[in-house]
Amino acid sequence: MSAFSEAALEKKLSELSNSQQSVQTLSLWLIHHRKHSRPIVTVWERELRKAKPNRKLTFLYLANDVIQNSKRKGPEFTKDFAPVIVEAFKHVSSETDESCKKHLGRVLSIWEERSVYENDVLEQLKHALYGDKKARKRTYEQIKVDENENCSSLGSPSEPPQTLDLVRALQDLENAASGDAAVHQRIASLPVEVQEVSLLEKITDKESGERLSKMVEDACMLLADYNGRLAAEIDDRKQLTRMLADFLRCQKEALAEKEHKLEEYKRKLARVSLVRKELRARIQSLPDLSRLPNVTGSHMHLPFAGDIYSED
């Protein structure tokens, strides 16, 4: 991948489109350069505010993709986006229409469902998006309309994934957190003192207490990071399950279509074969003109009309 620079990032952000491929491509580039997460977030926020209203939502889609897909690599982006994400939500919400707010609400729901941020940050995001509005009362008819729309959207099948995307998702899971033997060993080797509250009574001086505190902090960081990676792996496996289901559905539909086509062409072959058989039989029943006498090439003289009708 190309080297990181703020100028390169600004250029890539200026070329960012609303397509899934564009967002995912830039997201992968950013995650690859995650050691520059702080300047990346700074440039992202600056360019977000400069972007036209119809492009601002795409910036948040990019942030969402980076935050969620970088979790298995490390917590850098989740932490560095946290101080600016609330104001970013507020800015985009104030600059765009209600349709855009619905999409922002969907992103927020996913973050809440997957515990991307702590509850206090999620509450701030809700306030930035919805303000102090209370749930408005709706008539029974309005509720039924919303339910029907939701059912319709949930029931509509997803687009099947490209084969390359499916292969990439499977390859990503080859290095999943659950297979990290080194971390498993580190967790298994944690001293019992960091896991049993009852053992705190054995601390008799400040020095040993501070030493244990350092061990507990390290254990917390190790376990929190690994839990985050496992949560990301679970999300990846859920996504892969959906991708496989969509792919299988698509293949079943394609199979049914091709079987139908095969039957159709079998019938056509049968009709053409019948024509060929009948044609061969008809050809066999016709006279062979090549066996008739060659009238034009012989020396036989045909009689003249006068000879035929002459009187004796």
From Swiss-Prot:
Keywords of the record, alphabetical order, are: Acetylation, Coiled coil, Nucleus, Phosphoprotein
CDD domains xrefs: CID_RPRD1A (cd17011)
Positions bearing N-acetylserine = 2
Q: Which organism is it from?
A: Mus musculus (Mouse)
Using the record's annotations, give every residue carrying the modification Phosphoserine. 153, 156, 285
Q: Which family does it belong to?
A: Belongs to the UPF0400 (RTT103) family.
Q: What is this protein called?
A: Regulation of nuclear pre-mRNA domain-containing protein 1A
Signal peptide (UniProt feature, chain positions): none
Listed under GO cellular component are: nucleus; transcription preinitiation complex
Q: What is the lineage of its organism?
A: Eukaryota, Metazoa, Chordata, Craniata, Vertebrata
**What Pfam families does the entry give?**
CID, CREPT
* Known function: Interacts with phosphorylated C-terminal heptapeptide repeat domain (CTD) of the largest RNA polymerase II subunit POLR2A, and participates in dephosphorylation of the CTD by RPAP2. May act as a negative regulator of cyclin-D1 (CCND1) and cyclin-E (CCNE1) in the cell cycle.
